[in-house]
UniProtKB/Swiss-Prot annotation:
Changing residue 148 to E/H/N: Reduced affinity for NAD and prostaglandin E2. One of its GO terms (cellular component) is nucleoplasm. Keywords: Cytoplasm, Disease variant, Fatty acid metabolism, Lipid metabolism, NAD, Oxidoreductase, Prostaglandin metabolism, Tumor suppressor. It comes from Homo sapiens. Its EC number is 1.1.1.141, 1.1.1.-, 1.1.1.232. Detected in colon epithelium (at protein level). This is 15-hydroxyprostaglandin dehydrogenase [NAD(+)]. It is an enzyme of class 1 (oxidoreductase). SUPFAM superfamilies: NAD(P)-binding Rossmann-fold domains (SSF51735). The lineage of its organism: Eukaryota, Metazoa, Chordata, Craniata, Vertebrata. One of its GO terms (molecular function) is prostaglandin E receptor activity.
Amino acid sequence: MHVNGKVALVTGAAQGIGRAFAEALLLKGAKVALVDWNLEAGVQCKAALDEQFEPQKTLFIQCDVADQQQLRDTFRKVVDHFGRLDILVNNAGVNNEKNWEKTLQINLVSVISGTYLGLDYMSKQNGGEGGIIINMSSLAGLMPVAQQPVYCASKHGIVGFTRSAALAANLMNSGVRLNAICPGFVNTAILESIEKEENMGQYIEYKDHIKDMIKYYGILDPPLIANGLITLIEDDALNGAIMKITTSKGIHFQDYDTTPFQAKTQ
């Protein structure tokens, strides 16, 4: 898919990886709906992007992605404003082991809800023109993390859901591709959450273990993750792909064996 002229919706777009995604999409000629719960950060992000790009290229919508009605209203507003939707990036996420229900609602449930809303608008069988959905996971979605079991579970869920939904979308000839990104530690505000008891709960005493992991794996910068996003969008052959981004190997992909049933039906 060529990005130029397309309309993208990015959740968690006001800061960090989400903002890097928005900038990369705008540089490629897309129009971008900036969706974030943080009103102040969202307004500041929109203003900063307006200085670099034409103001009509972006739209900021405050939304709590864990609120189903707000999320539905947000999709409707984006399509009403821009007239279409081509690219969806479910990026909003938190790290909170203490309030673990919140973590699952934001990290996993909102991704599933957003994906189905995206399919409602983009699927060819619903009158859409096709498109692409990118769901943000993590290396924690591919490996165990003792100090963050709920965060880890939410990210594993994204990987399994995205791979399965990609197969379903292809089976239905929806014209929509689905892929996920699994980066290592990224230089965002989430890294600061490991210092706080209200985030880590019973695992706060192990924060030094996480710091040791960060030193071992290194820290990625958001623009590299945005490069991965553009790759997934522009390569029409990628569907159900799980992109890994690490300091040691850069952008690469997780290998999976074909299931016996898939092998039989191919």
